[in-house]
Amino acid sequence: MLRTTRWVAAIIFLYSFPGYAEETFDTHFMIGGMKGEKVSEYHFDNKQPLPGNYELDFYVNNQWRGKQDITIPESPVKPCLPKVLLTKLGVKTGNLNTEDNCILLDKAVHGGQYQWDISEHRLNLTVPQAYINELERGYVPPESWDRGIDAFYTSYNLSQYRSYDSNNNSNTASYGRFNSGLNLFSWQLHSDASYSKPDDMKGTWQSNTLYLEHGWSQILSTVQIGENYTSSLIFDSLRFSGIRLFRDMQMLPDSMQSFTPLVQGVAQSNALITVSQNGYIIYQKEVPPGPFTIADLQLSGSGSDLDVSIKEADDSVRSFLVPYSSVPNMLQPGISNFDFIAGRSKIYGVKNQEDFLEANYIYGLNNLLTLYGGTILSDNYNAITLGNGWNTPLGAISFDATRSSSKLNNDITHEGTSYQVAYNKYLVQTATRFSVAAWRYASQDYRTFSDHLYENDKINHQSDYDDFYDIGRKNSLSANIMQPLSNNLGNVSLSALWRNYWGRSGNAKDYQFSYSNSWQRISYTFSASQSYDENDKEEERFNLFISIPFYWGDDIAKTRHQINLSNSTSFSKDGYSSNNTGITGIAGEHDQLNYGIYVNQQQQNNDTSLGTNLSWRTPIATIDGSYSHSKNAWQSGGSISSGLVVWPGGINITNQLSDTFAILDAPGLEGAHINGQKYNRTNSKGQVVYDLMIPHRENHLVLDTANSESETELQGNRQIIAPYRGAVSYVQFTTDQRKPWYIQALRPDGSPLTFGYDVLDLQENNIGVVGQGSRLFIRVDEIPTGIKVALNDEQNLFCTITFQHVIDENKTYICQ
C-alpha cells in the first residue's frame, strides 16, 4: 500500500518555489518510494497517482462515505470504479450507458469533478445533486459499518468504604462492578455482574444482565438472547430471560429517530427552499420544478413551528407554516419502531416467575398523527395498550388507554383500565416551554405485569411489599414550565406533582421553583421546594448555590489550570439549615488530577465536617479516594477502575471502557495522544484504547504526536470509522520505525548536492532524500556501510559516502 508523509509534503512545498523549478525531482525521496518515477509524473496536483493498490477514504460532496480499496492501473489506462462501489457511495449509475461493470471516474462523477489526495489517503468526488442518493450529514450507510474484531474485554470498579462514629463503632462495605464482553463471529456476549460485601457478612455475587447480541443492518434492528431488561417503550421495564428483537433507532439518521414533520410542497421552477425555526435558517436546498419532500430536518428541541419559504426563479416568494410539537412515541411519517420479546420474568425477590410475550409497535402515519400500541400476554395476565400522538398548531398531545387482567393464584381476578394524557407546547413569542402529563387508574383493580407478579408472590409466600411496591395508584398529574427571561436576566423553571391513591384519604403534593443566571464568570441558582405527604405533613426547603471559576495559563506557553469555588446554603421554614463551601480543580501536565476540598456545617446537630476527594487518571486506571471528619464520625473511601482488552494483537489495559470502543495501532509510536485526551497515550507498542465511540456514526480518530518523543514517523494521523453497537474496532495507522539520521554532505568541489535527489544504500535501495542546504535525510534499520547520491541523474552519475558503523550528525561529509 502506498503512503506519503507530512514531511514529504513539506519537501514538495519547498520544491515548488521558482528557485528550484529547474530540478527534476525523483520520487525516491519517499521513504520506501517507487524507483524510477519522477515527481512530475507522480501528480500531486490532482492527476492520476502512481499505479498500485490504495485504501482510500471516499468523500462524496464533502461527506465521508466509507473506506474502500482502489487499484490504479498503469498509464495510459484511466482508473475506474466498480458499479457496486458507486452504489455503496450513493452515486446513481442507472443513466450511465456502459456494459462494463467498472465505470471511468470521468463518467462516474456525471460532469462533476474528482480530486486525489494521496497524502491523506482520500478521493474526493463532486457529483451534481441530482445524481446522488443523499445522506443526512453525519450518517453513515450500513454498508460502511464496522463489525470489529474478535476480542474479550472487561471493565471493573472496585471500591471500599469505612466509617467510625464517636462510640468507636465501625462499618466497612466493599463493592465491585464488572462489565465484560466477548466478541466472536460478529456476535457479542455482554455481562454485567457485581459483588458486594457488607460489614461482617458474607459477600455475594449477583448477575444483572447476561445476553448475546447481534445487529442486523438489513432490517435496522438488533436481537438479544439471554437475561436483560425489556424496554419502557410502552409498558414498564422489567427484568427477563429470553429473546428480544427491536428496532435500533440509532441505526437510523438522527432526523428519523424522533418526530420531525415532513416539509412538502410544489415548486413552479428551479426554486430555493428555506426552512426556518425561531428566526434561524435550519435548512436550505435548491429543487427542480415539481413536487418536493424534505425528510432530513435536524430540529432543535424547542418544538416551535417551522416557517417554509419557496423562492422561485422569478424571485417570487411563497411561504407557509408547518406545525411542530412532539410528545414521547411520536415518529416521522413513514417511520416505524418495534420491540418484540418472548421470555420469562426474572424480577429480584419474586419466587414465582411467569412466561410471557410482549409486542410494541409505533408508526408515524403523517405530519399530524402517530399511532402506537402494545400487548403483554401470559397464562394469568394480559394487557393491551392503544394510543395516538397528535401534532397540532396548538401543541402536541398524546392519549392512550391500557386494559389489564390479572388472575391470582387464589383465583381472584383483577381487571382495570388506566389512561394517560400528555401535552407539550413551545411558545415562540415568549420562548416558554411547558408540558403536562396525567395518569388515571379507573379502578383499584388495574395491575401492571410487575404488580401481578409481586401480588402473586405476596399471596404465595406471605411477603409484605407494601413498603416499596404500591398497587393503589389512583390519579397523578405533573406539570413543568421553563421560561428564559429577556435581556439575559436568567432562566426560571416551575414544576408540580400531585398524586393520590385508592383507599387513602390524603394527597401527596410536590412543588419546585428554580432561578438561575450568571454574571461574568459567576453563576448562581436559587431553588425552593415544598412538599406534602398523604398526612398533609409539610416540608419546605430553600437553597442558594454560587459557583466562581478561576483560570490561568493558555495551554500553549503555560499549562492551563482551573479552580472552581462554590458555596451552597440551605434553609428550611425554621431558618438556616446547612452550608457547604468547596474548592474543586484540575491539575497535572495531562489534566490527570481532579481534586476537591470542602467544609460542611449542619445547624441541626451543630456539627462541622471537613472533607477532601482526589481522582488520579493514568493511562491504565483511574484511582479515587475520599476522606471526611467531624466531631462525631469520620469516613474514608477508595476505588479503582480500569479496563482490560484481550485481542489477537495482544493485551491492553486502559483506564475506562464502554461496550463500543476502538483499538488504535500505530506500530512503534509511543506517547501520542488520542482525540485530545491528554491522559490517554499510545503505549510502547504504539497501541491505545479509545472508548468514546458512537455506534453507526462517523468517528474521527486523530493521533497527536506533539508531545511524543518517539523517533517513529506517523504517516497520516487521522482515520474515520463507523462501528456497530458493541463492536471492538481495530484501526491501524501507518508508521515508519526505521531510525532517522540527518547528514550534512557536499560534493567533492564543496558545492551542495542537488535538492530532492534520492539517497540510496549500496544495494541501490531507496533510503532517503537530499533536503535543503545539502542536508541528507535517511531512515534505516541499521547504519549502512555507505550511501549513494546522484550527481547527475540523467547521466546516471553518483557519488558515495562511506561510514565505519557510525554516523556523526555534527560532521560534514564529502560525497566522493
Region roles according to the model:
Residues 3-10:
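Sec-dependent signal peptide recognition
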Residues 16-18:
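N-terminal signal peptide c-region/cleavage motif recognized by signal peptidases
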Residues 23-54, 65, 84-89, 96, ...:
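Flexible, glycine-rich linker and terminal segments associated
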Residues 294-305:
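Extracytoplasmic assembly/pore-lining segments of large envelope/extracellular complexes
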